[in-house]
């Protein structure tokens, strides 16, 4: 494996060359997104012989960096759910972590806006839900207060949520990966898991180098792990299925973004959201001023057939104008250019409504495996809290 294909931020000492030449490990983490890197950093503080394997050339190339980069507050999720608990805890942990480790972020707050009495009642319900989850500092503000903060936004009132912010997910992943390696963890990219074989006191993890798309023969390497942690994101259901766990299926939902042209970036100062979709599919097309002073419009939310279908049949800019016009009346098609898209790991199938909770649990039939499935938003915000939760499950296995 060429080291030129590895992330620049990975210390050379952390690179594992094929063959792996390791027979056994305490922990193998599958998936090197923000959650996988957070788990690697946390578990390697407690245990030695920790391995993180990622099939892509760099860490965080999937959903972890193809999003709005928002630090969520926890107002949307059902009280008592893992999403609510881990988001609220993760919000506090993430701000502290960013301050300590000089990770680029901004605690800017956000406005969730409304236009009529019905929407005002929905905003008040959203605030009550947030308070039940432990979110503090929220308040309802009137049109004048909205205009003072966002002069070009049309809203009769809004829920102000000061604990929301934005973060450089790339910086966060870089720091987590570096800390994991400094603590002795071994990180491997371009390593695809092709087989998981449960044994009496371990799971055998079989890897091949690369994506195998060229059809070339690849040698297999196997690590016998006392604990396997599935952090494979969009592919977590496929990893679980290798252990005979078919309980959950991931339905990919693509979210597309546009960006305001630079000349119109003055139209938005911070974060402005509509009320979330009633079906729970998304938070709606919102406006995000990034850390680089660009303004994102999106994401949309549409089910797609393939987990890597980022670009086929992209929506035209006119569709973004239609969806954003109720927030920003001045927006026109000429103000927008297509940006990137991301794919979310939804557990709710097409045609159904509701918010599915994170699945974070020991596998019911394979006692040495921990499954993390359906880790979509607020996964970035929750990542450090998720890692702490996973440590407690790993301790049950490794004690």
Question: What is the predicted role of each segment?
Answer:
Residues 69-145, 149, 155, 284-285:
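Dinucleotide-binding Rossmann-like beta1-alpha1 core, especially the glycine-rich loop
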């Amino acid at each position: 494996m060429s080291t030129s294909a590895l992330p620049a931020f990975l210390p050379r000492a952390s690179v594992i060359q094929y063959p792996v030449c390791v027979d056994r490990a305490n922990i193998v983490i599958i998936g090197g997104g923000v959650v996988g890197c957070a788990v690697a950093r946390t578990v390697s503080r407690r245990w030695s012989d920790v391995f993180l394997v990622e099939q892509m050339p760099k860490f965080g190339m999937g959903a972890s960096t193809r999003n709005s980069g928002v630090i969520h507050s926890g107002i949307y999720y059902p009280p008592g759910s893992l999403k609510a608990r881990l988001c609220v805890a993760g919000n506090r942990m993430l701000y502290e972590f960013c301050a300590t480790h000089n990770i680029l972020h901004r605690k800017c707050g956000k406005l969730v806006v409304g236009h009529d009495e019905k929407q005002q009642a929905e905003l008040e319900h959203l605030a009550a839900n947030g308070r039940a989850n432990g979110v503090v500092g929220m308040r309802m503000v009137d049109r004048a207060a909205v205009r003072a903060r966002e002069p070009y936004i049309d809203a009769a009132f809004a829920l102000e949520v000061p604990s929301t912010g934005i973060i450089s997910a790339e910086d966060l992943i870089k720091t987590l990966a570096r800390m994991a390696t400094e603590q002795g963890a071994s990180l491997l990219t371009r390593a695809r898991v092709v087989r998981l074989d449960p044994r009496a006191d371990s799971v055998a993890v079989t890897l091949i180098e690369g994506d195998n798309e060229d059809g070339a023969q690849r040698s297999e390497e196997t690590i016998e792990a006392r604990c396997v942690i599935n952090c494979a994101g969009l592919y977590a259901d496929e990893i679980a299925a290798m252990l005979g766990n078919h309980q959950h299926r991931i339905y990919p939902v693509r979210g597309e973004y546009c960006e305001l042209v630079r000349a119109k970036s003055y139209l938005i100062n911070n974060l402005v959201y509509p009320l979330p979709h009633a079906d729970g599919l998304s938070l709606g097309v919102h406006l995000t001023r990034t850390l680089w002073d660009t303004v994102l419009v999106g994401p949309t939310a549409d089910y797609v057939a393939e987990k890597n279908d980022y670009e086929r049949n992209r929506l035209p800019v006119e569709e973004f104008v239609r969806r954003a016009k109720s927030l920003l009346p001045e927006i026109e098609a000429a103000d927008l250019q297509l940006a990137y898209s991301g794919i979310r790991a939804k557990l709710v199938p097409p045609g159904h409504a509701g918010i599915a909770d994170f699945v974070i649990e020991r596998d019911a039939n394979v006692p040495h495996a921990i499954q993390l499935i359906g880790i979509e938003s607020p996964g970035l915000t929750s990542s450090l809290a998720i890692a702490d939760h996973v440590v407690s499950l790993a301790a049950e296995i490794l004690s």
